[in-house]
Design a protein with these regions (language model features):
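Outer-membrane beta-barrel transmembrane domain signature
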Residues: 190-201, 357-361, 383-399, 403-413, ...
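Surface-exposed coil loops of outer-membrane beta-barrel proteins
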Residues: 39-62, 104-122, 132-246, 294-299, ...
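Beta-barrel outer-membrane channel/assembly domains of diderm bacteria
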Residues: 19-140, 171, 317, 325-326, ...
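Residues that define the transmembrane beta-barrel architecture of outer-membrane proteins
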Residues: 26, 64-70, 117-122, 158-164, ...
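Detector for outer-membrane/organellar transmembrane beta-barrel domains
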Residues: 220-234, 244-387, 395-404, 457
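Alpha-helix termini
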Residues: 79-85, 129-133, 261-264, 405-413
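Transmembrane beta-strands of outer-membrane beta-barrel pores
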Residues: 36-42, 78, 96-102, 142-146, ...
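Bacterial Sec-dependent N-terminal signal peptides
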Residues: 1-21
Length: 460
């Protein structure tokens, strides 16, 4: 036995000597983002606070009255070296998200409360960048893989690929595979069904595959053109399945132009994007832009052959002086489901849903830096939504928010903020009479109101 161990050690020693990985520069970081506070609606039922934005648009038209939420982002960063050669930057990232549902304050609820505190894990992944000193990078896991956003609306408008999967990149070219299947098919193309094999019936999931290719072209003046292409596919169910779903697919093409602008203070920019998706890749509703969240009901064959979605976005920031910054945006989206109906049709689970919609939202934020630490924020937004052949629901929203910026920077990105928020929304007749916002679902007023104190932060 002793001789066997000696021989084994001799065999393993060369491998250990020539391939030992030394971990250096080990670091732990903890970041956090969030928004929390209190507020009420002076003219609302029970003065209970409810979001003022139009239904189906999420935070588009501003999010000063957004639900409480908080993210914790622990991460481990390390740089392994192999025999003194070039290093690789490796990060293990986790994001723990918590938010309150049903309009409740986060501190007044818990996970035991019905529709109360919700805890999610939207990020757990490993990413290796510049592998062995090369221009190659790779990642695997689940992550918020998203880029430019309209911050005042929390709207990641072009390339939000948040889901589970993996990806590789070389220089400015990225290839990604996502698999966003779920047993909860509410609001998205159904993946879950049951299959009977040898007399036993068990649940199964159709695995949607989302192949994504992206390439960025960088210019000497700092401007960037980004090209996007996607292909989505879901397979057919077998003869043993209790439900028949045909195979289906879709594709996406898009282009985004980002251009830095020369103003008195740095940081100004203009961004413009166009994206078109077809088939099951026509997602983009409820304030998100996930192309895999298929919109609308299918056709008579259970497919989305003629479905589409078109979205264009304009977004800019102007840092005009030490006193003034202006952040503006415009969003247009038109989507069609798989059905030929101009109004409503039947979804897979038997419910009726709209087959066509159009969103138009424009707005902006004006920041006046009264002092280094007192910033006066004003916002104006206009939003409209047309579902099917219904009349248009529309809203104007106005917000004034004196803000304490304790870090004392005259910068639109300076955080944390402590804000005193006053918001008022004026609805048209159709929106008011048809409950076209969470606020209007418990009130039927021409004007919706909100007064509150909120804090917003991101610390990394």
């Amino acid at each position: 036995m002793k001789n066997t161990l000696i021989i084994l050690l001799i065999c393993l020693s060369p491998a250990c000597i020539f391939s030992q990985v030394v971990i250096t520069n080990t670091n732990f970081s903890l970041g956090t983002t969030g928004r929390i506070g209190v507020g009420l609606s002076p003219n609302g039922e029970g003065t209970q606070w409810k979001p003022l934005n139009l239904s189906g648009q999420g935070s588009l038209a501003g999010r000063m009255e957004q639900n409480d939420y908080m993210d914790l982002l622990p991460a481990i960063h390390f740089t392994p070296k192999l025999n003194g050669t070039d290093s690789t930057n490796v990060t293990f990232q986790v994001r723990l998200g918590m938010y309150s549902a049903n309009g409740q304050f986060m501190g007044n609820t818990s996970t035991r409360t019905a529709n109360g505190l919700t805890i999610i894990l939207p990020e757990t992944y490993i990413e290796a960048r510049n592998i062995m000193g090369s221009r190659w990078s790779a990642w695997a896991g689940v992550r918020f893989r998203r880029y430019d956003d309209i911050h005042i609306c929390d709207y990641f408008y072009f390339d939000d690929h948040s889901a589970q999967g993996f990806g590789v990149s070389y220089k400015t070219t990225e290839l990604t595979l996502l698999m966003p299947a779920s047993t909860d098919s509410s609001g998205v193309y159904p993946y879950n069904y049951a299959v009977t094999v040898a007399g036993a019936t068990n649940p199964a999931i159709r695995q949607r595959q989302v192949w994504i290719g992206e390439h960025s072209i960088k210019f000497k003046d700092g401007s960037i053109i980004k090209l996007l292409g996607e292909f989505h596919y879901v397979p057919v169910t077998s003869k043993k399945a209790l439900k028949y779903y045909p195979a289906d697919n879709g594709w996406v093409a898009g282009i985004k132009y980002s251009n830095p602008l020369k103003t008195t203070l740095p940081g100004s920019f203009n961004q413009f994007s166009i994206r078109y998706g077809t088939g099951i890749a026509n997602g983009g509703d409820n304030g998100n832009t996930f192309t895999w969240a298929t919109y609308g009901p299918p056709d008579a064959n259970g497919k989305y052959t003629h479905a589409y979605s078109f979205t264009t976005v304009e977004h800019f920031l102007l840092n005009l002086s030490r006193q003034v910054s202006i952040n503006g945006y415009g969003v247009f989206t038109q989507s069609q489901g798989g059905s030929s109906s101009p109004n409503m049709d039947t979804y897979f689970n038997g419910t009726q849903m709209y087959n066509h919609k159009r969103d138009i939202v424009v707005g902006g934020r004006f920041l006046f830096y009264a002092t280094d630490w007192l910033h006066l924020i004003e916002e104006v937004h206009y939003a409209s939504r047309k579902d099917g052949d219904n009349p248009e629901a529309a809203m104007w929203k106005f917000t004034f928010a004196p803000t304490i910026a304790p870090l004392g920077k005259r910068d639109p990105w300076c955080r944390p903020h402590i804000r005193l928020v006053f918001s008022a929304a004026r609805y048209n007749d159709y929106a008011r009479d048809n409950h076209y916002s969470p606020y209007l679902q418990i009130n039927q007023n021409r004007w919706g109101t909100y007064i509150g104190v909120k804090t917003e932060w991101w610390l990394f």
